[in-house]
Structures are given as C-alpha cells and as structure tokens.
C-alpha cells in the first residue's frame, strides 16, 4: 500500500485536475448555449434558401446552367476539413481527421487531393500526409458571416479558375451536446435538381428567373459554408463540455478511492503505533 505522503500528494493532484475540468465544463456550457442558439436560428433560413435554389434550378433550361454547376472530369479535389484550434474535446477532431482520410483513400483514390484546413488540430495531423492548400485558424476569432463569406469566395474562385474540379466540406454537424454527426457535403460544383414537382411551381420572377438564380447561388454557397462553420463551432463546445463532464466524474471517483485508501492506511498506521506502545509497556512491566 502506498505511504501516506504519496497518497496525500495524489489526492491533491487529482483534486486540482478536477477543479480544472469542472471549470472548463462550465466555460464550454456557456459558449455552447450561445452557439446552439445561433445554429438553431440559422437553420430555417439556410434550409429555405436551399429549397428556393432547388426550386428555381429545376425550372431552368439545361443551357442556362450556372458556371458554379459546371461538371468537369474530376482530376483535382479540394477537401475542406473543419476542425478546432483547441483540444480536450473528446473525439471531435479525431472524427474529422478519420473522415478526411477515409474519403481521400476510398472516394478520391485516383485523384490529386489537397486539403484546406480550418482549425489548428486538423492541420497539425493532415499536413503530415497531404498537401495543405491553406490553413485558416483565424476564423474562430470572429465567426461572422462576412469572414465565412470571404472563405467561400476564395473557394468559389478556385473552382472557377479550374484549380479544382470538386470541392467538398467535411465537418461535425451539431445534434445535441453529446452527439455530433460527421458530414461530407459537396460544395462545388453545386448539385443539380430536376424534379417534376419543382418544375410545376408557379413563381413570378422580377427581374428574371436566370438573374435571380445567378445572384442566389453565391449567397447560397456562402450560407452553406457559414452553416457548416456554425455547426462545427457548436459541436466543438458540446463535445468539450461532455468530455470535461466525464473527466470530472472520473476524477471525483478516483479522488474518493484515494481518500478511502488514505484513511485505511492512516488507520493501519495508528493501529500499529498503538500496538507498539502497548507492546513496549508490557515489556517494561514484565
């Protein structure tokens, strides 16, 4: 059994760790509340914008397609891996890295693949195996629509310049604090929709259907990326809060076990001292 001094030291160390994990859990819970509100409020608008684009795209003639919908032979692929700058978030970043590697190995095996990393954690790992087109760590300093739009415009220009024939997003979609779902979304070229139901919709267009679609597509792409970033941001804090909650529970359990061991060791030590005193007294009396 460990001596009393060692047990006291371990109890102090575990208690200190428990205070840190508990504080991190509280901070993440506060940030999660704001991030969850933001993504919850954004989703209806994003979904409606996507639905409107689908409805309008389905009514266009084939020769009126957008330059953002141009289908080319896929030779060069850019994977946008959205992670975080900080760790201690369970499997949040690991799941993104695994998903990127899986897609690169299975879906785009014969293609030239570059990675656009958002967040330090994915960049630190993926740069060892893939060519990193760019790393953006600053977006989380101010996660605004304007800053997300700047990244989206950069990606759109890369596609228009034919630097890449396909651009995909890999990110964690927020479901709840304990559950994040890895998503793999095609960003460019935009997917074409052709349903008879959509073609029968009756809209009045001003100025024209084609002009509206041309203006709507860039806005929709910017919103798609912004939503992915918001989802990832909420997922990060949900994952970290859950991880720190579990870490705090484990630290509490370990501390209680150590205290029990300490009390048993202290009791044994006191008992031995009493026995020694009694034994010494009996020897003197004998």
Curated annotation (Swiss-Prot):
Subcellular location: Cell inner membrane
Matching HAMAP family: ATP_synth_gamma_bact
A Pfam match: ATP-synt
Topology in membrane: Peripheral membrane protein
Source species, domain of life: Bacteria
Subunit-structure text: F-type ATPases have 2 components, CF(1) - the catalytic core - and CF(0) - the membrane proton channel. CF(1) has five subunits: alpha(3), beta(3), gamma(1), delta(1), epsilon(1). CF(0) has three main subunits: a, b and c.
Name by which UniProt lists this protein: ATP synthase gamma chain
Chief site of localization: membrane
GO molecular function, one term: proton-transporting ATP synthase activity, rotational mechanism
Protein family (similarity comment): Belongs to the ATPase gamma chain family.
Keywords tagged on the record: ATP synthesis, Cell inner membrane, Cell membrane, CF(1), Hydrogen ion transport, Ion transport, Membrane, Transport
Function recorded in the entry: Produces ATP from ADP in the presence of a proton gradient across the membrane. The gamma chain is believed to be important in regulating ATPase activity and the flow of protons through the CF(0) complex.
Organism of provenance: Christiangramia forsetii (strain DSM 17595 / CGMCC 1.15422 / KT0803)
GO biological process: proton motive force-driven plasma membrane ATP synthesis
One CC-aspect GO term: proton-transporting ATP synthase complex
Gene coding for it: atpG
